[in-house]
Amino acid sequence: MTDYRTLFSSPGAGSTVTTPITLSLLLLLSQATSDPCYDPGGRPRFCLPPVTQLVGKAAAPCSQTCALPAASPGPACNSSLTLDLDGSFLLTSVTLRFCTAGPPALVLSAAWATGGPWRPLWRRPAWPGALGGPKKVTFHSPPGPKTRIVASYLRVEFGGKAGLVTTGVRGRCQCHGHAARCATRAQPPRCRCRHHTTGPGCESCRPSHRDWPWRPATPQHPHPCLPCQCHPIGATGGMCNQTSGQCSCKLGVTGLTCNRCGPGYQQSRSPRMPCQRIPEATTTPATTPVASRSDPQCQGYCNVSVSSVHMSLQRYCQQDYVLHAQVSASSSQPSEAVGPEWWRLAVHVLAVFKQRAWPVRRGGQEAWVPRADLICGCLRLRPGADYLLLGRAAQTHDDDNYDPARLILNRHGLALPWRPRWARPLRRLQQKERGGACRGLLPPTRSPGPRN
């Protein structure tokens, strides 16, 4: 291996020859490794792939015209020729070669998709008394960014017999100024995108660089895609919306870059959950009165309070309904008294895992809770929270407001804080019930009423 120190040593044998050669090689190497889409300082700039010979698919009409004598009538000629470029390209020139004098009139059109609409690019009208045109016709795309022609199909309409020999179409891939290289033979042609763009034609930004909407590059401004400014803790990742730049935020986090806590949340010290819900101090009867737990009349009234339940098939079948619901967090009137014995709560049913005789529909519902159950703290419901509700259908009641279609929440059921991991096993139990697994498993008898 050559030591570079010998190439730039003091004059001696061969040093005057090797120094210019080495400088030339280094210059060529720097030109080969430089990126046309970036200047020497690393700043983005407008770039285009080189012009290449494009491949078209078409059969030249009247291909035997050149071999026929001049006096021979010859076969009937087609009136047009369509070229499929196998992709979208920026056209630079179209060349048509004829074996005899070309047709007196020609019309060249371009289209984006199969069947048009066709856009006329060049028209050569027939002069009165003209017998034919030249044997070679070349169309050049006009210069300027506003006059660039993007086409996937070309159509040539002849005004007479045409003995067409070859068609030459030159152009470059449509990379919107964001690429200097392109695989023209790929299906579809794919640009080697720069400026953090992506897509076959560099027509969109990468998911991690969508701080501004995508724009094509121009010689005046390269319009590179900018990285998303997502907060490293408040966002779920580094990707943002293509149009607005909105980052995907964690629960309780808001803002375009996920940099602050939303309403009802406060900052925490956990990087996994940077915003936690603010505990609500509420006086609604839906919460548990602490003083009522020492009331002698409430001793032994409620069922044993549990925080978790093993949901076996038998326990599931013994329930009249199993719901995933959310207690309304409205601050106007989440609950109200209805008569001396009942309170009415607004709930939103999110999922029904077991249906009762009177169907419970998803959406907004009115849940009825006995006043005594609330006073004794049998149900601990917090507005805005999700719960798994296990309960029994209403039975005969002496109250005039009784309705068998009511959704009753009482001390005989359970209201457990919802856990997302419960959804899948509950769906499996629901499928078993539909298959008849609950037949013969009757619910146990309920207690007749409160004990004094």
UniProtKB/Swiss-Prot annotation:
Q: What GO terms fall under cellular component here?
A: extracellular region
Q: Which organism is it from?
A: Mus musculus
Gene Ontology BP, a term = neurogenesis
Gene disruption: observed consequences: Deficient mice exhibit ectopic motor neurons that migrate out of the ventral horn and into the motor roots.
Glycosylated residues, chain numbering: 303
Query: InterPro entries, from UniProt?
Result: Laminin/Netrin_ECM, LE_dom, Netrin_domain, Netrin_module_non-TIMP, TIMP-like_OB-fold
In terms of SUPFAM superfamilies, this protein maps to: EGF/Laminin, TIMP-like
Q: Which cysteines share a disulfide bond?
A: 173-182, 175-191, 193-202, 205-225, 228-240, 230-247, 249-258, 261-275, 298-376, 302-378, 317-438
Which PANTHER family has this protein been placed in? NETRIN-5 (PTHR10574:SF262), NETRIN/LAMININ-RELATED (PTHR10574)
Query: Which N-terminal residues, if any, form the signal peptide?
Result: 1-34
Q: Where does it reside? A: Secreted
Function, in words: Plays a role in neurogenesis. Prevents motor neuron cell body migration out of the neural tube.
Q: Which PROSITE patterns match?
A: EGF_1, EGF_LAM_1, EGF_LAM_2, NTR
- Going by the entry's taxonomy, the superkingdom of the source organism is recorded as Eukaryota
Quote the protein name from its UniProt record: Netrin-5
Q: Where is the NTR domain?
A: 298-438
**Assigned keywords, A-Z:** Developmental protein, Disulfide bond, Glycoprotein, Laminin EGF-like domain, Neurogenesis, Repeat, Secreted, Signal
Residue ranges of domain Laminin EGF-like in the record: 173-227, 228-277
